[in-house]
């Protein structure tokens, strides 16, 4: 693990006394980020749906950073006005914001696109539009500060390889990937290029709510491992923060992604990895 002093030297945005805003902060990766950044001396704004989990998370982070350095804001990221209000609260309480982690998301499976319009809309409103709302609300003021800043949007490997099973989730995370790529390009063309965007791509991560599991599966990483890897990647200047886990190392992910883009290049059927006519070819490709 990289020492905090080395991280903060490489990334002034994460310096002591600076402010991080984290959505989806009441549990999982978001809460792990809040605790880790609090240990680094940052002020923390935790945003999540209001309730006991957010209250508990706020107390846990305040035990590290102190009550005066923590602000909890009940916020539904699917609603632009609530994210605007979150930004007003964050800037009002702490002045500048130097890190925005758009991490809130849900893993609901609304099924086929032709039988559950409301379910699809809810998932996309949270997973995709929630990130757009965060960027809209915070970016202008982060740019105006003329200070170093970071925006980290949480995507998913499912937004890249798009496996069958939860099409709506895949669509939402594919949108996050494309949006964040374009955001990074736009920001690096701003005068001074002091604000950058990055795509966090977690692997199999145990959050305490993972598929109903009460104990961490052997193949999963913890949220804390994801955040340590994220910080190491940011120090390197990575845009794609492609996290491994205890089941899938990076070379395995790379081959799966290469096969997915190969569907276009080789003119194979969509999602050929799961097509019976290409099952053997995929297996041979993975072994090669």
Predicted regions and their residues:
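Conserved glycine-rich cofactor-binding loop
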Residues: 19, 26-28
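SDR active-site lid
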Residues: 185-250, 261
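Conserved mid-core segment of classical short-chain dehydrogenase/reductases
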Residues: 84, 107-121, 165
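Active-site helix of classical SDR
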Residues: 135, 172
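Residue(s) in the substrate-gating loop at a strand-loop-helix junction
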Residues: 156
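Conserved glycine-rich Rossmann-like NAD(P)H-binding loop of the short-chain dehydrogenase/reductase
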Residues: 40-57
């Amino acid at each position: 693990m990289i020492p905090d002093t080395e991280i903060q030297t490489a990334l002034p945005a994460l310096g002591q006394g600076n402010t991080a805003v984290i959505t989806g902060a009441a549990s999982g990766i978001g809460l792990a980020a809040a605790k880790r950044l609090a240990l680094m001396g940052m002020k923390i704004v935790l945003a999540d749906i209001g309730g006991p989990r957010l209250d508990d998370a706020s107390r846990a982070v305040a035990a590290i950073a102190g009550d005066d350095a923590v602000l909890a804001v009940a916020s539904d990221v699917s609603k632009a006005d609530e994210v605007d209000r979150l930004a007003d609260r964050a800037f009002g309480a702490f002045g500048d914001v130097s890190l925005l982690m758009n991490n809130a998301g849900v893993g609901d499976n609304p099924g086929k696109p032709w039988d559950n319009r409301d379910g699809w809309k809810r998932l996309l409103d949270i997973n995709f539009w929630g990130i757009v709302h965060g960027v809209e609300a915070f970016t202008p003021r982060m740019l105006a500060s003329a200070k170093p800043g970071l925006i980290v949007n949480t995507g998913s490997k499912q937004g890249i390889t798009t496996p069958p099973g939860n099409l709506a989730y895949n669509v939402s995370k594919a949108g996050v990937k494309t949006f964040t790529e374009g955001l990074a390009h736009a920001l690096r063309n701003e005068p001074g290029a002091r604000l950058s965007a990055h795509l966090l791509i977690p692997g199999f991560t145990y959050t305490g709510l993972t598929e109903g599991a009460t104990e961490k599966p052997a193949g999963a990483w913890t949220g804390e491992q994801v955040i340590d890897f994220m910080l190491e990647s940011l120090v390197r200047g990575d845009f794609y923060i492609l996290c491994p886990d205890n089941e899938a190392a990076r070379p395995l992910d790379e081959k799966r992604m290469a096969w997915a883009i190969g569907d276009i290049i080789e003119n194979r059927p969509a999602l050929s990895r799961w097509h019976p006519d290409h099952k053997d070819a995929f297996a041979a490709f993975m072994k090669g």
